[in-house]
């Protein structure tokens, strides 16, 4: 049996990891914080030594150094590759005017989406610290995207930069809206803020999807991913598909392609 690949997605809020076998199946997964204060270290004690680590890191140099230390402690000398966006890879063509400016997480997510939904036009909406949208044609061409503040960031910005509005987390907002989803307008300030920011997310997605379908004159599958996807999905009036492992799946494909060329 060939050695597995260790895949690491270091996002703006947390770090997710997976172990992928030779068939690119994610056989073990987990998550941990950027710092020890953010939670325990990853539970890698019983993992077999991987062939190498493939990393998407959009969280910065400090997180990169933490990952290096964790890897060196568990598997000294383990080969590792921090991916960068390319003009083309794994069947996806990068439409950015400067391809390397595209975040490595978005690039890996596009590759994962292309493999999960081959030969389909896609709008991929990922809900994290930022909300990102990617337009991917059925032939693998990424034609561009959008970046907006995420749901939590929208609410935090309003709480921080106004005198009378509360600062809400997504957990608080979800609780407030649990019994109010059927109401288009809310009757107190916390719920109004929660729902307003939620509808801003949903409105962005629906407008982008309609514009894309009109421009391409073809059906477009809407794919949702990320931590806030459940709440935003409930506010959408469009059919959609949930997939929460696009980035890790894309990393598995990148690792497999590179290993095949060794």
Swiss-Prot record:
Mind telling me which Gene3D superfamilies this protein's record contains? Answer: 3.30.420.40
GO molecular function terms noted in the UniProt entry: ATP binding; pantothenate kinase activity
Q: In which pathway does it act?
A: Cofactor biosynthesis; coenzyme A biosynthesis; CoA from (R)-pantothenate: step 1/5
Positions the record marks as coiled coil are none
**Protein name per UniProt:** Type III pantothenate kinase
| UniProt key word Transmembrane helix | no
Q: Which family does it belong to?
A: Belongs to the type III pantothenate kinase family.
Instruction: Name the chemical reaction catalysed here.
Output: (R)-pantothenate + ATP = (R)-4'-phosphopantothenate + ADP + H(+)
Q: What SUPFAM superfamilies does the database record attribute to this sequence?
A: Actin-like ATPase domain (SSF53067)
Q: Which UniProt keywords apply?
A: ATP-binding, Coenzyme A biosynthesis, Cytoplasm, Kinase, Nucleotide-binding, Potassium, Transferase
């Amino acid at each position: 049996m060939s050695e597995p690949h260790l895949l690491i997605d270091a996002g703006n809020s947390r770090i997710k990891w997976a172990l992928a076998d030779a068939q690119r199946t994610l056989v073990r997964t987990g998550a941990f914080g950027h710092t020890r204060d953010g939670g325990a270290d990853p539970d890698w004690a019983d993992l077999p030594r991987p062939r190498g680590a493939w990393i998407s890191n959009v969280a910065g140099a400090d997180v990169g150094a933490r990952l290096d230390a964790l890897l060196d402690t568990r598997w000294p000398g383990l080969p590792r590759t921090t991916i960068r966006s390319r003009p083309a890879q794994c069947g996806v063509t990068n439409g950015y005017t400067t391809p390397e400016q595209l975040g490595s997480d978005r690039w890996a997510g596009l590759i994962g989406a292309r493999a999960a939904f081959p030969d389909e036009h896609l709008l991929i909406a990922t809900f994290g610290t930022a909300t990102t949208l990617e337009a991917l044609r059925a032939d693998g061409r990424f034609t561009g995207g959008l970046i907006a503040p995420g749901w939590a960031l929208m609410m935090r910005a309003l709480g921080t930069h106004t005198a009378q509005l509360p600062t809400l987390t997504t957990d608080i907002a979800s609780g407030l809206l649990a019994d109010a989803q059927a109401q288009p307008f809310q009757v107190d300030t916390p719920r109004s803020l929660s729902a307003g920011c939620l509808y801003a997310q949903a409105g962005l997605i629906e407008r982008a999807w309609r514009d894309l379908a009109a421009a391409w004159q073809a059906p477009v599958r809407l794919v949702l991913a990320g931590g806030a996807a459940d709440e935003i999905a409930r506010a959408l009036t469009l059919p959609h598909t949930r997939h929460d492992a696009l980035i890790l799946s894309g990393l598995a494909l990148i690792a497999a392609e590179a290993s095949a060329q060794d």
